[in-house]
Structure formats: structure tokens, C-alpha cells
Amino acid sequence: FILKVYKKDQRYLLIKNTKFNFLKNLSIFPMKELSNPKNFNENLNFKMSNMNMNIKIQYSKDSQKFPFSYWLDKKKLNSYMLPSFTKKVVQYLEEN
């Protein structure tokens, strides 16, 4: 998977997941699944249910218009109802 990170000030762009069967209708970072990755150096590796997710993080400057999107303030992370997947990604981004 390619995970696209859009950051403005101290906020991250999240979208409502309507694309993937996992974490359906929950807030995640914009992602794209790669069918046959070549030379893929992952940043993160998650195990979710019966799925192994290798994730490459891609930082983007220009924020596109995404349907059902909002900006998450990292300082108020605990006040949002988010899947642990999204929280782990934010934690990784803050540490690296």
C-alpha cells in the first residue's frame, strides 16, 4: 500500500474509507493499493486480521480535494474516535 500524508501546520488530512473492505467507513489516511509492487521498501508493516499490510509512506505538499475528508489536529488525537491503525500511523509519523 502507498499511504499519502498531507500535513498542514500540525494537522493531518484523513478521509472516510469507502475504498477498502477493511476499516470500512472509518477515518484513515488516503491510501492506494499496489497490485504488484516492485522495489518496494516499506516504512510500516501492520497485521490486521488475516492480512499483512506493507505500507510505504509518501509525503505530499498539495492537498487534493477528497470526498468525506477532514483535518485532524494531532494535539487532539485522543478526542477523535479513530481506528488503532490510524493512531499507529500518526504515532509513527510523529516519531520519524
Feature roles, as predicted:
Residues 1-96:
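Intrinsically disordered, low-complexity, charged terminal extensions of DNA damage-control enzymes
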